[in-house]
Amino acid sequence: MADILHRIGIKSTSIEDVYRALTTREGLASWWTSNTHGEGNQVGNIIEFRFGAGGFDIKVTELNPPTHVLWEVAEGPEEWIGTTISFELKQDGDYIIILFKHMNWKEPVEFMHHCSTKWAIFLMSLKSLIETGKGTPDPIDVKIDNWN
């Protein structure tokens, strides 16, 4: 099994604002993909994320407001199905630190390399959303290769 790991600091004193950006349709659509359907604020909910060429459905499996969000990929690209996505939040001075994990990839295929870079880009979009009020979700995100 292989994992994608990132750490990012968001200059904010409101961990609740970051948590809401991870658990509401409005929040998710403002930093990840504007084509988001469903709410992530209850365990068991399914959130549908769509991008230009495809997308995936994610089940909310754990919530510990305002410090932890855990998802499991239910539908989507074969490499993503069964993987889990975790956001751990903690206050550290003037920053909210996010420890991000996209876990349990069966193997480190080329698509995982692409997704690792895209996760970094979307986490920077989340940072921008909280710090400036404007994120860069798909379709206005940074395009990195011919897969998007």
Language-model features: where?
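A conserved amphipathic terminal alpha-helix motif
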Residues: 104-148
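Hydrophobic pocket/interface hotspot
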Residues: 18-19, 28, 47, 60, ...
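Short coil-to-beta transition motif at edge beta-strands of beta-rich domains
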Residues: 41-47
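Hydrophobic ligand-binding cavity/cleft-lining segments
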Residues: 1-38
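Short structured motifs
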Residues: 4-5, 44, 84-86
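Hydrophobic-ligand binding "helix-grip"
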Residues: 38, 50-97, 103-106
